[in-house]
């Protein structure tokens, strides 16, 4: 699609900047580390989430390793196992049921793995939805067959509404991954912010990770937390975008939410990051107001703190370079 006044077309220059409709987008100001330090400090100041200590769970690690071994390609999946374990022992450490934590971990391994084009292309992902409807894929061995069994188990661990939502979120993620792997998404219309938000929501499986916060054993009544789900979803997306920024800049990645939002809104990268911080802080306050005091609020607060630690305690995001500290798990 050729660029006109109605389209935003992005391509890389030799200097690593981006061209938007014939104009150079505003580059990141100053060094990446300095910017990230400032952004992360501002994020912590505005969101006001505590920083509790989290520990490894050897039993969970052993159980997950045994299951992943049956999927094949264990070595290639190892980095995704590390990230998924860290997510569970931090953001979902408040969940008492061991089997629920196992399923969250396995779900996450497959979601992250399918985000890898090498893994995605090795699976029959493009026919996933149709084969799910016909019941064929449920009997297959390997990762996609395992994924269907994980999804089937969600009704054992979450209320009907939440389990339905988790299932639908997973299907939306696979659909979005197909689009990202088959379509040139570097060309955006100049007023495409709603599409950028829509795509980000699908690829982040935000509905699933929001619903994971409130398991059925403690929260059988969805009405207790349902109105908080949209802002919890926003938190899932934006915290990841803010705290993944350093990793993505190191890798030279520009096909991501921060850059795409900056392009379609005409803002600089630092301004875009600060807007996300403000929107995240507002979302946290709304969740707190909606949930009030009690167990549902406590579950969210644990998730909010743990989800930050997912990024600061994980070598995947390289944030030790920026803010110091130690990683929870370097490898398994």
Curated annotation (Swiss-Prot):
Record: residues binding Mg(2+) 1: 115, 180
Binding locations of Mg(2+) 2: 240, 244, 248
Swiss-Prot/TrEMBL cofactor(s): Mg(2+)
Entry note about domains: The conserved DDXXXXD and NSE/DTE motifs are important for the catalytic activity, presumably through binding to Mg(2+).
Protein name, UniProt field: Monoterpene synthase 25
SUPFAM superfamilies: Terpenoid synthases
EC number: 4.2.3.-
Role summary: Terpene cyclase that catalyzes the cyclization of geranyl diphosphate (GPP) to myrcene and linalool.
Keyword Lyase: yes
UniProt short sequence motif DDXXXXD motif, positions renumbered to this chain: 115-121
Gene source species: Postia placenta (strain ATCC 44394 / Madison 698-R) (Brown rot fungus)
GO MF: carbon-oxygen lyase activity, acting on phosphates; metal ion binding
Record field: transmembrane: none
Alphabetical keyword list: Lyase, Magnesium, Metal-binding
Ranges spanned by the short sequence motif NSE/DTE motif, renumbered to the chain: 240-248
UniProt superkingdom: Eukaryota
């Amino acid at each position: 699609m050729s660029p006109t006044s109605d389209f935003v077309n992005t391509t890389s220059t030799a200097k690593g900047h981006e061209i938007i409709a014939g104009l150079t987008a505003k580059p990141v100001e100053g060094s990446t580390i300095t910017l990230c330090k400032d952004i992360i400090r501002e994020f912590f100041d505005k969101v006001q989430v505590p920083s509790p200590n989290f520990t490894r769970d050897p039993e969970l690690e052993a159980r997950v390793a045994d299951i992943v071994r049956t999927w094949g390609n264990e070595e290639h999946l190892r980095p995704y196992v590390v990230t998924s374990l860290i997510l569970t022992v931090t953001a979902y450490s408040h969940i008492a049921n061991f089997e629920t934590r196992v399923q969250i971990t396995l779900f996450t391994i497959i979601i992250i793995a399918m985000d890898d084009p090498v893994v995605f292309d090795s699976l029959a992902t493009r026919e996933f939805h149709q084969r799910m409807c016909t019941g064929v894929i449920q009997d297959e061995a390997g990762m996609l067959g395992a994924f269907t069994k994980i999804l089937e188990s969600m009704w054992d661990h979450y209320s009907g509404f939440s389990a339905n939502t988790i299932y639908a979120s997973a299907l939306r993620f696979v659909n979005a991954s197909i689009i990202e792997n088959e379509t040139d998404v570097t060309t955006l219309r100049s007023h495409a912010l709603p599409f950028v938000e829509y795509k980000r929501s699908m690829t982040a499986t935000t509905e699933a990770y929001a619903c994971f916060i409130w398991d059925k054993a403690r929260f059988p009544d969805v009405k207790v937390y349902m109105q908080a789900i949209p802002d919890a979803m926003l938190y899932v997306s934006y915290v990841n975008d803010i705290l993944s920024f350093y990793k993505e800049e190191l890798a030279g990645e520009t096909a991501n939410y921060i850059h795409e939002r900056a392009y379609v809104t005409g803002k600089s990268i630092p301004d875009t990051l600060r807007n996300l911080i403000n929107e995240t802080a507002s979302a946290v306050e709304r969740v707190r107001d909606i949930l009030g005091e009690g167990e549902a609020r406590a579950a969210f607060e644990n998730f909010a703190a743990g989800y930050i630690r997912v990024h600061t305690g994980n070598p995947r995001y390289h944030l030790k370079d920026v803010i110091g500290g130690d990683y929870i798990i370097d490898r398994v």
